């Protein structure tokens, strides 16, 4: 995958809601939410991506896609960072 944009709090933001925008080898645009938790006491990192957060990410992605002449297929992934390790959840949610 190739990195297209990152929200690193230094300079111009890609989006207020989207942490990473990447393009996979098949051309799919991947919007990535990164979540970190020090413990699973409240359901873990993946559980922290609520329905409200998902809607905000989808809204921001649609706004980003409007800037493109020919928007490609896209998907929404979540990367979780926990004491037990890092997990990449591809297609974690969809835009519906």
Question: Which sequence ranges carry the predicted segments?
Answer:
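Active-site metal-binding core of divalent-cation-utilizing nuclease and nuclease-like domains
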Residues: 1-31, 96
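Active-site donor-binding loop signature of nucleotide-sugar glycosyltransferases
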Residues: 3, 34-36, 91
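Short connector loops at helix/strand junctions that flank enzyme active sites
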Residues: 13-17, 27-29, 44, 52, ...
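Conserved catalytic cores of phosphodiester-cleaving nucleases, focusing on short active-site segments
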Residues: 18-22, 26-41, 49, 57
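Residue-level recognition of specific faces of alpha-helices
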Residues: 20, 45-48, 75-78
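Residue-level signal for pocket-adjacent positions within structured domains
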Residues: 37-40, 44, 84, 88
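Short, charged, amphipathic alpha-helix that recurs within catalytic cores of restriction-modification
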Residues: 45-68, 72
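Domain-level recognition of nuclease-like catalytic cores that cleave nucleotide substrates
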Residues: 66-96
């Amino acid at each position: 995958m190739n990195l297209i944009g990152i929200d690193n709090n230094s300079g111009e933001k890609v989006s207020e809601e989207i942490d990473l925008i990447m393009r996979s080898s098949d051309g799919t645009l991947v919007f990535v939410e990164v979540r970190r938790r020090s413990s699973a006491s409240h359901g873990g990192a993946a559980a922290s991506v609520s329905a409200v957060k998902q809607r905000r990410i989808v809204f921001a992605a649609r706004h980003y896609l409007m800037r493109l002449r020919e928007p490609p297929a896209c998907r929404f992934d979540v990367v979780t960072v926990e004491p037990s390790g890092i997990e990449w959840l591809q297609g974690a949610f969809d835009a519906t």
